[in-house]
C-alpha cells in the first residue's frame, strides 16, 4: 500500500484515502501505520464507527477520519451513515478525534435531515454518497437524484460544512 500511495503522490495526489474495513480484507492495521508514516501528504482514514477503529485512529492520528457504515457482505460502501439515529455516539467520536487535531467527516446519503444532523454534531465535513446516482438509468430518476445531491451539498455549505462527493 505504501508504494501505491507514494506513486499517487508522485503523480500529484494531494492526499491519500485508505479504508480500513473491520474484516481487514483490503489492508491491515500495520499498513495504515506504514502509510501514515511514509507519505508526505494528508491521510484520510475511512473506517466504521466502532470502538476498535476509533482506538486505532486515535493512535495513528491521521489528518482526517471519515466514518462510513459497513456491512460484511458488501463489496463497497452501499449507503450513508444514519447520523440522525446515532447523533450522541457519533458526537462522542467527533469530540475524541477533534481533541487530537483530527478532522472529522461523515459519509451520508443525500438527505437534508442527515446534513442537518451532521452539522448538529459539529462534523468538519461530509461526503455525499453518489452511489445511487451512478446506478440509475432513467433520465428522470438521474435528474431527481442529482437534485438531491445538489440540495444536500448546498445545505451543507450553508451550514459551514466542507463538502465532498463520491
Task: Write out the residue ranges for each language-model feature.
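Catalytic cores of alpha/beta
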Residues: 51-60, 111-121, 165
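Hydrophobic faces of well-ordered beta-strands that scaffold small-molecule active sites
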Residues: 16-18, 43-47, 65-67, 104-106, ...
Amino acid at each position: 500500500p505504501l508504494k501505491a500511495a507514494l506513486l499517487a503522490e508522485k503523480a500529484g495526489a494531494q492526499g491519500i484515502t485508505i479504508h480500513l474495513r473491520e474484516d481487514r480484507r483490503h489492508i491491515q492495521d500495520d499498513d495504515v501505520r506504514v502509510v501514515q508514516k511514509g507519505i508526505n501528504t494528508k491521510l484520510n482514514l475511512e473506517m466504521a464507527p466502532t470502538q476498535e477503529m476509533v482506538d486505532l485512529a486515535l493512535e495513528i492520528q491521521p489528518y482526517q477520519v471519515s466514518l462510513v457504515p459497513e456491512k460484511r457482505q458488501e463489496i463497497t460502501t452501499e449507503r450513508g451513515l444514519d447520523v440522525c439515529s446515532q447523533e450522541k455516539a457519533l458526537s462522542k467520536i467527533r469530540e475524541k478525534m477533534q481533541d487530537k487535531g483530527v478532522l472529522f467527516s461523515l459519509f451520508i446519503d443525500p438527505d437534508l435531515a442527515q446534513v442537518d444532523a451532521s452539522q448538529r454534531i459539529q462534523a468538519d465535513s461530509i461526503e455525499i454518497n453518489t452511489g445511487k446516482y451512478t446506478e440509475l438509468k432513467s433520465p428522470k430518476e438521474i435528474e431527481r437524484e442529482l437534485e438531491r445531491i445538489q440540495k444536500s451539498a448546498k445545505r451543507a455549505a450553508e451550514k459551514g460544512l466542507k463538502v465532498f462527493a463520491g
